[in-house]
Amino acid sequence: MNHLFNEIVPFGQHLARVANGWDGHPGLIAFGCSLGALHAANLYLRRPDLFNGLLALSGIYTASYGFGSYMDEVVYRNSPVDYMANFPSDHPYIPLYNSQRAAICVGQGAWELPESTRQLKDIFERKGIHLWVDIWGHDVNHDWPWWYRQVEYFLPWLLGERAA
């Protein structure tokens, strides 16, 4: 994970600055679908100082899905439901989360598993973290056509082009 935070993210920021002629800090949004949603959420939740937003679609945010009751430090640090449940309510990242645009979305249709998204939503509410957690209907499946629609829906908001 340190390789991502210390090398890949700064390199991506450098490329964005060079390609666009920007000065300063270009915004990065952590984004992913399915397993990529877990990775995006994990990156953003662990280092919101490196990202300007999050869009996580149809993820499973608990390690118990793949590891059952097994837990060690590596598994814990990659299981947002577990580490966010223990996140201090006065952590300095909370104002940072609350000042950025971040959305986690899941459907309730075929192949979707919304329970860990609901768990994260409850944890965020208890901690005063105001991420947009959106649970779509029973017709929304774990599949590319729905993710395409969700990106179209959330992207203008993430870019500040419309209100939530």
Q: Where are the regions that the model predicts?
A:
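Non-catalytic cap/lid and distal C-terminal segments of serine-dependent acyl enzymes
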Residues: 1-164
